[in-house]
Amino acid sequence: MDIYQVIQSKRSEVLLLAGRFGVKNIRIFGSVARHEARARSDIDFLVEFPPGTSLLTHAAFQRELSELIGRDVDVASVKGLKEQVRHTVMQEAVPL
């Protein structure tokens, strides 16, 4: 199964997991969003965490998401993006 099929097949489960953590507006960016992903590419997620979300909760969500999908993932929030990359990420981000 390629990376795009994996994402599609796990979409409902990802949304349930996100709901448990209060995560909203889940988008994908990076090589997967640009359709340039390779067999070992990770999946970059852009999300909105609830106000006051701790770094530990962020890390727990990322770990559980990676385990669910069976691939390395990176999870970023819009607020956590560096100013230099924010515009590019926002332009290429696509809804899950």
What are these regions (language model features)?
Residues I26, I43-F45, V73:
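Conserved beta-strand core positions
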Residues G30, H35-S54:
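Catalytic metal-binding acidic patch
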Residues L15, G19, T53, V94:
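Basic nucleic-acid-binding interfaces
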Residues M1-Y4, K10, F49-L81:
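Metal-dependent nucleotidyltransferase catalytic core
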Residues M1-I26:
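Helical scaffold of the NTase/Pol beta-like nucleotidyltransferase catalytic core
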Residues R11, R40, H58-A59, R86:
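Conserved strand-to-helix beginnings and helix N-cap segments that scaffold or border functional pockets
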Residues T88-L96:
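Short hydrophobic/aromatic patches at helix-to-coil boundaries
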